[in-house]
A protein has these predicted regions:
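Targeting-peptide/extracellular-domain and disordered-appendage signature
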Residues: 2, 24-94, 99-133
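Bacterial Sec-dependent N-terminal signal peptides
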Residues: 1-26
Length: 133
C-alpha cells in the first residue's frame, strides 16, 4: 500500500511539474507590439504599433478593404508621439501623442492624425471632427 502511495505521489509531482514548465513557454505573439523612438531636431518622435501578420492572407483589398478607414496596425491604432511642435504637410502639429489612421487604396493611401487615443481599433466610432489633419 505504501508503495502505491509513493508511486501515485511521484506521478502527481511529475504531472504538476510538467504543467508548470509548459506554462512558462513563451510563444511569439501573432501581431507583435513594436516601438521605435528617433531623435528629431531637439526632441524625439516615437511610434508604437502592432505589426499585422498576413498568415497567408491578402491583407490590402481583402482583410483590409480598399477605401475604408483602417486603424493602421493590428489590435489597436498606431500611435505617433511628437516631442515638440512639428509641421506635417505644411500644417502645425502640437507636441503630443496622436493615433494614426489611414484609408488604403490600390494606388495611394490617405493618412490621418487623430486626437482621440481612446478609440483604439474601433473604427466604427471614428469621428471626422477628431482628425487633426
Amino acid at each position: 500500500m505504501l508503495q502505491k502511495i509513493k508511486t501515485f505521489t511521484t506521478a502527481l509531482a511529475i504531472t504538476a511539474f510538467s504543467l508548470t514548465t509548459q506554462a512558462q513557454l513563451k510563444t511569439p505573439a501573432p501581431s507583435p507590439l513594436q516601438s521605435i523612438k528617433q531623435n528629431f531636431a531637439l526632441s524625439e518622435i516615437g511610434i508604437e504599433y502592432s505589426r499585422p501578420s498576413a498568415k497567408g492572407r491578402v491583407v490590402f483589398g481583402d482583410v483590409v478593404p480598399f477605401g475604408k478607414i483602417w486603424r493602421t496596425g493590428a489590435n489597436s491604432a498606431t500611435k505617433i508621439t511628437f516631442g515638440e511642435d512639428v509641421k506635417v504637410e505644411g500644417q502645425n502639429v502640437a507636441a503630443g501623442t496622436y493615433a494614426l489612421y489611414s484609408i488604403p487604396n490600390k494606388d495611394n493611401w490617405e493618412l490621418m492624425l487623430y486626437k482621440d487615443l481612446a478609440l483604439g481599433g474601433n473604427t466604427g466610432e471614428y469621428k471626422k471632427e477628431n482628425e487633426l489633419m
